From Swiss-Prot:
WD repeats lie at residues 14-57, 62-101, 104-143, 146-187, 188-227, 230-269, 272-305. Belongs to the SKI8 family. InterPro entries: G-protein_beta_WD-40_rep (IPR020472), SKI8 (IPR051510), WD40/YVTN_repeat-like_dom_sf (IPR015943), WD40_repeat_CS (IPR019775), WD40_repeat_dom_sf (IPR036322), WD40_rpt (IPR001680). The gene is skic8. GO terms for cellular component: Cdc73/Paf1 complex; cytoplasm; euchromatin; nucleus; Ski complex. This is Superkiller complex protein 8. CDD domains: WD40. SUPFAM superfamilies: WD40 repeat-like (SSF50978). Keywords: Cytoplasm, Nucleus, Repeat, WD repeat. Its main location: nucleus. GO terms for biological process: nuclear-transcribed mRNA catabolic process, 3'-5' exonucleolytic nonsense-mediated decay; rescue of stalled ribosome; transcription elongation by RNA polymerase II. Gene3D superfamilies: YVTN repeat-like/Quinoprotein amine dehydrogenase (2.130.10.10). Pfam families: WD40.
Amino acid sequence: MSTQYSILFKQEHAHEDAIWTAAWGRSEKDGSETIVTGSLDDLVKVWKWSDEKLELQWTLEGHQLGVVSVNISQNGAIAASSSLDAHIRLWDLETGKQIKSMDAGPVDAWTVAFSPDSKYIATGSHLGKVNIFGVESGKKEHSLDTRGKFILSIAYSPDGKYLASGAIDGIINIFDIATGKLLHTLEGHAMPIRSLTFSPDSQLLVTASDDGYIKIYDVQHANLAGTLSGHGSWVLSVAFSPDDTHFVSSSSDKSIKVWDTSSRSCVNTFFDHQDQVWSVKYNPTGSKIVSAGDDRAIHIYDCPM
């Protein structure tokens, strides 16, 4: 158990080009931990995390253009990736084989997110729609219409009740998943929403924007509960720790910040990347953070528990 924040491991030259996305999952089967990364080099890579180091397990080929988003199912068995080639691909993490490819066209799928029960994958489109695909069927099963602009980011609430989307014009929409109804439209940002994340108890929504701010919303009442500044540029990624106590952000200012949820204060800043940091996530226990970005490196940090 670590008592302070520190960098634990660096994987330099992890990809041939910028890394835009990373996910950290744990297999329900054997407890093994996997990190999946996606890059502008068109590749998805699967890394095993054990003995405090990363080992490349699979290099997954299939996308024709850069990979913009990856996500891992709740049971740690499947990864989803989306690419500028407008396809979503599902991969078996045990064998490294492609399970299926879904055409998310006509132009693009940006963020991909598994539903909490891992039966569905949601993705945002340039037309302001959230398209929801069945993992089993591989077909589009529902669509939620924001009547807005290109959706860059989406997140499911862990309790399965809500889906939030963030658009290129800074507008955030929260939907009731059961009814498909639009519940709230949040207009706190004026620039693209790169990332959003619900707290583990589904009470808070944290948003990251090119305006340099992180905002915290009370989901039920759609109230703005906090505005955090500290990054010197675009905020590209936000993620909650599994125990609700902290969340982490990354920015094009090359830094990663860890925030205390209750005090809304920054408790640690990492300046280890050489370029903008596109993706940051906690591991399933909240003891580690993974980050990746334009410098093609994957970093693992230790968090005090």
